[in-house]
Structure formats: C-alpha cells, structure tokens
Amino acid sequence: EVTLTPQHGDGDEAVYAGCVLLSGKGGVLVHDIGINGTTYRHYAREDYIEQLALLEPELLIISLGTNDSYSYSFSMNSFRESLDRTIHLVQEALPRTKILLTTPPPSYFRQAHGGQHGRHRQSKASTVSYTFNDNARRVAAEIMRYAEANGLAAFDLYSAMGGEIGVEQWIQDGLIANDRVHYSVRGYERQGQLIAEALQAALGA
C-alpha cells in the first residue's frame, strides 16, 4: 500500500502525474507510457517532456502516428510540425537519450451504413464497410524520411507488416481487432516481436 500526502501551502497547487515503483533488482527497466487516442501533437508539450526527462531513459521508443493519420482531413504539414516539435523538445530535455521512431501499422477507415431507427421509420440492419487508410502509408514514409534527415534510428513497422497487401494476412490470422484499427493481443505481441528483432539485429545480438 502506498499513501501520497502533498505538502503545499495556501494557494499552491499539487499535480499528481504518476509514480514509479522499483523492485531494486537488476535487468532492463521498461516504462510503457500511452493514452488512447493520442497523437504527436498531444506529446509536443514542454511540461510533459520535462516529466519524461525525470526517468532519464537510455533509449526512448516513440510509436505514434496511427491516430495522426486516422482522419479524412489529415494534413501532412500539421503532422510534420507536430513530429518536429516533439523530437526537438525531447532532444533538448534528454540530450543523451537515444531515440527510435517506429511507423504506424496499416489500418482501415470504418464506415457504417443504414441502421435508421425512429418512430415513423422502418428499422433496418446496418452494414459496415472498410476502406484502407492510405494516410498511414504517408505518415510512415514521412517518419522514415524525417529520421534519415535528422540522424535518428527508425523502424518501418508499416513495411515490416507488408503494407496494404500484407495486412490482409494479419486479418485472416485474427491479429487485427474488428475495427481494423487496433490489433488483438497476439497482434500487438507480434508487432513487439518485430521491433525487438530489429533492435537485436541493430545491436548485433
């Protein structure tokens, strides 16, 4: 049991952002930070990066881009600005931390049709269709371009999964959730395995 008691005077504000419990054992220490629906723009904040810097990570793996790309009104210019600002804030706060960018995996736009219900309307079953999200491919290409231009390590998860063609096999294997944006537990485990294998190859392990 852990009890936190803020110590502050009148008019002061205490903000709880999280805590880290260490076992004291050796080995690799991994922090997994993420919030559903976030984009590069959400992390491009000085206050957040300052908190991140307290962890003093040796390696920071940034896996974003799916939510950035999941919009019919997607703007590449806005994405570039958010990506660049996030990286610059990280580099300023964590100059000794190595950065690894990963690209978003393939995804689909989901559209529901029909299913009207009302007092004077005849209800009918709705149908769902899926359209491949080409913005994910564009974001993946931009992340790889940005990484090369700025001397950063990057792993192209989009291509490693086979892109628009290869993702069909992932669907057949049950590795993608029904919304075709998120992945199943096995799907995320497979993504993690691909990234881990790429890291091991880069480190010569």
Write out the residue ranges for each language-model feature.
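Conserved SGNH/GDSL esterase-like catalytic core that processes O-acyl groups on lipids
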Residues: 1-85, 92, 182
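Hydrophobic/aromatic beta-strand patches that form the interior of the parallel beta-sheet core
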Residues: 31, 100, 153-155
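Residues at the C-termini of beta-strands that transition into short coil/loop
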Residues: 34, 103, 158
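Catalytic His-Asp segment of secreted/periplasmic serine-dependent ester chemistry enzymes
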Residues: 45, 107-205
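Structural beta-sheet core signal
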Residues: 62, 101-102
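Short, catalytically relevant binding-site loops at active-site mouths
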Residues: 68, 105-108
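Short, hydrophobic/amphipathic alpha-helical packing segments
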Residues: 80-87, 140, 192
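A short helix->loop->beta-strand "cap" motif at the edges of active sites that frequently abuts
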Residues: 94-98
